[in-house]
């Protein structure tokens, strides 16, 4: 099934703790070239909730429960200088991992203090924060025809994965999401799955990186020739997290 099947968070089981939401906003120059100060007076948080019977609520609040779900974590980045053909990122997650997702962004687009920098509005820095191509203007066409990555290999304890000849960028952008029943992105976002059905919470395969040697477990990427900009390699991974609810308190395992 393609249903995520994620468990609900039992708020009644953490009655001795506070549930807080922390929002961190980008600088204004990240998303606009407006020079006047913009403000957000208020916003709403919309939740999907289930109301249960008092007896069930008492059971959930009074008994020990263990829930396993998947979470997304950000991996340390890697800077790649212009003209560099080969770059390696040591993979250091400390949890069982379902999927790896990575992309490349030109360094000038990463400076949140700058919003200008192009000869047209579409080539300004603020308009290209989510431009993962080698073009200076984002569009679906530029993402398709200008990928910064040529090919990639993943080495696990020195053994290369996947064990196929054609590991070019389109393998990780199109084939892996298709065979894993994931959405195929318009942007140049690359995926490798250790799970058969990564969209589902129920375990269907993973790789426990905590049991591996990080210096022999790397993402080895080959960049396109002729790139004139510096790039930053961003990698995120989806892993399993265990939550224990007991005595009104939640703890992480």
Which stretches of residues belong to each language-model region?
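Flexible assembly/topogenesis modules
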Residues: 1-253
């Amino acid at each position: 099934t393609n249903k995520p099947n994620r468990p609900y968070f039992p708020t009644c089981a953490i009655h001795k703790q506070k549930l807080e939401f922390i929002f961190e906003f980008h600088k204004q120059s990240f998303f606009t070239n407006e020079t006047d100060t913009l403000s957000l007076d208020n916003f709403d948080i919309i939740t999907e909730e289930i109301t249960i019977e008092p007896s069930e609520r008492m059971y959930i609040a009074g008994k020990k429960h263990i829930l396993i779900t998947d979470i997304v974590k950000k991996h340390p980045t890697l800077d790649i200088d212009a003209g560099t053909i080969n770059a390696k990122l040591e993979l250091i997650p400390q949890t069982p991992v379902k999927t790896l997702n990575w992309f490349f962004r030109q360094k000038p687009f990463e400076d949140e203090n700058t919003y200008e920098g192009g000869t047209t509005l579409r080539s300004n820095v603020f308009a290209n924060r989510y431009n993962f191509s080698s073009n200076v203007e984002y569009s679906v066409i530029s993402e398709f025809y200008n990928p910064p990555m040529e090919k990639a290999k993943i080495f696990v304890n020195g053994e290369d994965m996947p064990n196929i000849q054609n590991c070019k960028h389109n393998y990780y952008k199109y084939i892996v999401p298709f065979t894993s029943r994931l959405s195929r992105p318009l942007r140049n976002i690359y995926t490798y799955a250790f799970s058969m059905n990564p969209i589902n919470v129920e375990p269907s395969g993973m790789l426990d990186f905590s049991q591996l040697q990080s210096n022999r477990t790397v993402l080895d990427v080959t960049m396109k020739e002729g790139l004139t900009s510096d790039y930053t390699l961003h990698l995120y991974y989806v892993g399993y997290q265990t939550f224990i609810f007991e005595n009104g308190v939640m703890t992480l395992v």
